[in-house]
Amino acid sequence: MLNIALFGPPGAGKGTQAKKIVEKYNLAHLSTGDMIRKEIAEGTELGKIAEEIIARGEVLSDEFVVRLIENSMAQHRGVNGFLFDGFPRTVAQAEILDRMLEKEGTPLKGLICIHVPFEELKRRMLERAKIEGRADDNEEAIAKRFREYNDKTVHVANHYKKKGVHIDVEGNCPVEEVFNAITKAIEEMK
């Protein structure tokens, strides 16, 4: 089973690359962002809570996110593997994911970290806001999300570096070049 986490700051292109990876390797795509946006669009109680938190540029609790992931994994039994997109975001989430996968005998094969300079990330996110109208793509929320990423999320990379499954990919180039670098990394970890 091929379990991979796609990692990087907001606006790095994780969603774009995830679609291509899922298609090529036939993995179940577990995107916390998609799951949360679905809850918001459907107007569920969880969605209303999430919408308020996200609009403030804050990150949802580990418990909230882990519950979404566990429910989704349970719905995808018998797949070739999972592509985790937007998860784990904290070391606590990484440790929970490690335990969940090890319990199944299928540990995480790689954390693929997409690197893009801050100014390019900001430009991408503001452009995306014009197109998609996402509430979390305004200047104030963007700045807060980057602080959160730098304060908490970047420690996840260190967690997986210690395990020897962290892979860096340059993301400030055309989509196909990024995908080729990711594909090469996946082939080496299989």
How does the language model describe each region?
Residues 1-190:
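Glycine-rich phosphate-binding loop of ATP-dependent small-molecule kinases
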